[in-house]
Amino acid sequence: MERLATRLLDAARVPRGIVDGPGAARPGRRDVSSASLRFCRYAPETGDDAGEAPWSTCRPHADAAWLALAPIGDVPGLAFYDAARGAWVEPERGREGSLLVWTGLMLEAHDPAYKAAVHMVRRADRERVSAPLLLRGAPDSPDMRAVWKALQADDAAGARASLLADRELVS
């Protein structure tokens, strides 16, 4: 997975200095990373859920990460918004055992040509378990702190300006 992530970030021309590495999450700690491997459990749909919104506990959102990767399991439910079609698409159906990769808000802030993937998890008739890996930036670099603050304020333009402020890191 590391080689795949490195190739994807290199293809997007993301500077290595602002990507998380050993010891990036906490100064002096080489055993901690700000990348996040999440284990998510989604309860199955019940009759009581019929009138509720189509998502489970995961409403439509984009991830605060450079990239996200997740193995595709046997219970589909992940849906991505396709702005060109104005519709939700479900790329997991029929692709069990594959790996799904999508773009995050940090990549969009770095280069607006890459749009963060808006996604949600739809309800299923069975329990769904997922394990997404979120590849995040090195939070101790000054530019990344500003990027995080801008992303939390839903300000993509401010996040991009923060990335571009440090000319040594962004080419």
Predicted regions and their residues:
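Conserved double-stranded beta-helix
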Residues: 2-77
